[in-house]
Amino acid sequence: MNCLWYYLGNPDVEPLEDVAEQKAFVEKWLAYAKKHNEKVWLISHIAAGMDIFESYKMWFQKMFVKYEGVVSASFYGHTHDDHFYINRDLNDEKRRPVHVDFVCAAMEGLGGNNPSVRLYQYDDETKEIVDYTVFVAKFEEMAVSNKLEWKEFYHARKQMGVPDFKPETMVKWAEKMWEDEEAFQEYMRTFHTGKYTKGECVGKCKVENLCELLYIIKEDREKCIAEHPY
């Protein structure tokens, strides 16, 4: 998908119901996949996180509910960080989690991070992600050797201590970090692909990062922030 159309930097797009009829195109083929018992991966530069118009975020939430079990995984970049977003059922009072966006850090290392790539492992039948490995090339090592050397940084399931990446699993993992400061600091280290000093992100920074991970819709995210005074 070309989700850059929905980017906040494109104000002319905001009032449009379906720019370039992309939503209709996506739903057409998701309906086809559902009818034929097929699985789908969505790939785009930008996820339905902080940087797209709210109306399109709402569409993503509804789409992932409607085609739950069809969209096995979705992959994004844009933020230059290593993280996730949790999509939820907006018709559910408790905001049931329905889909996880996998957001990969960037190869060029902008934003104070090291260059990074992910190697995904998936189930051949369900097409769900079962694990992934992150590799980084550290700038401080390149400064000495003048070479780009990719080294294994972490295995996701082992690093996070999770059995899978199902939405409910990821919510439990994220919410654990409200109390487990060591786990949160480790998350920030992987978030910044190793270029992070323990204790840099605390208080307001921690609350905003966790609420952004847990809630995509602005109203829900602001409620989350209000419930966790720093």
Give, region by region, the residue ranges found by the protein language model.
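Active-site-proximal segments of metal-dependent phosphoesterases and phosphodiesterases across multiple
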Residues: 5-24, 31-79
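Metal-dependent phosphoesterase/phosphodiesterase active-site architecture
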Residues: 2-32, 36, 81-230
